[in-house]
């Protein structure tokens, strides 16, 4: 692959929304320079420990090698880089050497809130992150099932961020527990990273029937109960023994499928508006 020479041609990096320097750190992996590979990866990606587990690997869809064979296994390589970094101390806490004296409040500790906190802290600002839930992570913590993203991975990174000087305040609902005017007095800047909390609903006969749940509510209750009591507190919606219908075939819908199956659902049917993908390549393709 061209990655082995560190070259970037055609659309080799266009698939990554973060514009990761994929050929560069793939070349460094190829030559065994793992610490340099981590440094190049971390230059554009604050959280490779998350993306290497849950990212849909758009980089592999854009990989030039995929035109005539299999694409480079970029996500697996990324996972190897970050876990090697943890194992060898490359990902150890690195507090900023100089503080600016500026104070920033970030509302929300999901992916965008954590990324903003990390970037601003690296620049020497004093950062405090407010989270309404009882744990840091937003949808990373409660919207993605533990089977897909083990929550110890999130805690590992958050603990490093704490050692680097970032403050986290959980169980604090801005607007209720503290007024925006108070934040403006305490901080030089306030950044809103609240996420999209309003689910997409449908208009259909029987929509108000019992037993219908929004996906994130279903997933959140299950993960909370798992973390708090290993599913012994009964504070979650159980699909055990039930015939389950899931509307939506995206990542969240698939997470609901996996959760329902693990809970022991009698049957699971998934509805998707898009046409079913082909099971084999067409003769003229």
Regions from the language model: what does each represent?
Residues 3-5, 9, 48, 56:
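Residue-level signal for mature regions of secreted extracellular proteins and peptides
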Residues 32, 58, 263:
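Residue-level signal for short amphipathic helical patches enriched in basic/charged
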Residues 11-14, 18-53, 68-98, 223:
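Ferredoxin-type iron-sulfur electron-transfer modules in oxidoreductases and energy-metabolism complexes
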Residues 56-68, 186-193:
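Hydrophobic or amphipathic alpha-helical targeting/insertion segments
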Residues 4-8, 21-22, 60, 64-68:
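Detector for the c-type heme attachment site
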Residues 78-285:
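Residues forming the flavin
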């Amino acid at each position: 692959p061209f990655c082995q020479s560190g070259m970037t041609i055609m659309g080799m990096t266009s698939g990554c929304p973060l514009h990761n320097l994929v050929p560069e750190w793939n070349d460094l992996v190829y030559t065994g320079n793992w610490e340099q590979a981590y440094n190049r990866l971390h230059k554009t990606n604050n959280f490779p420990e998350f993306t290497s587990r849950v990212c849909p690997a758009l980089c592999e869809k854009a990989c030039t090698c995929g035109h005539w064979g299999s694409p480079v296994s970029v996500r697996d390589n990324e996972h190897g880089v970050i876990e090697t970094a943890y194992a060898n101390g490359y990902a150890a806490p690195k507090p900023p050497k100089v503080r600016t004296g500026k104070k920033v409040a970030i509302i929300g500790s999901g992916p965008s809130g954590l990324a903003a906190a990390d970037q601003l802290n690296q620049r020497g600002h004093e950062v405090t992150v407010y989270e309404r839930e009882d744990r840091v992570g937003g949808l990373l913590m409660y919207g993605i099932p533990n089977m897909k993203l083990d929550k110890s991975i999130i805690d590992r990174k958050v603990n490093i961020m704490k050692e680097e000087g970032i403050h986290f305040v959980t169980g604090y609902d801005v607007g209720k527990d503290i007024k925006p005017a108070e934040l403006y007095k305490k901080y030089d800047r306030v950044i809103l990273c609240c996420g999209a909390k309003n689910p997409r609903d449908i208009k259909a006969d029987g929509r108000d029937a019992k037993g219908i749940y929004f996906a994130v509510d279903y997933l959140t209750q299950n993960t909370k109960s798992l973390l708090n009591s290993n599913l012994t507190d009964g504070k979650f919606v159980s699909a055990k023994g039930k015939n389950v219908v899931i509307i939506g075939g995206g990542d969240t819908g698939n997470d609901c499928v996996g959760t329902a199956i693990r809970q022991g659902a009698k049957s699971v049917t998934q509805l998707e508006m898009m046409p079913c993908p082909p099971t084999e390549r067409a003769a003229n393709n």
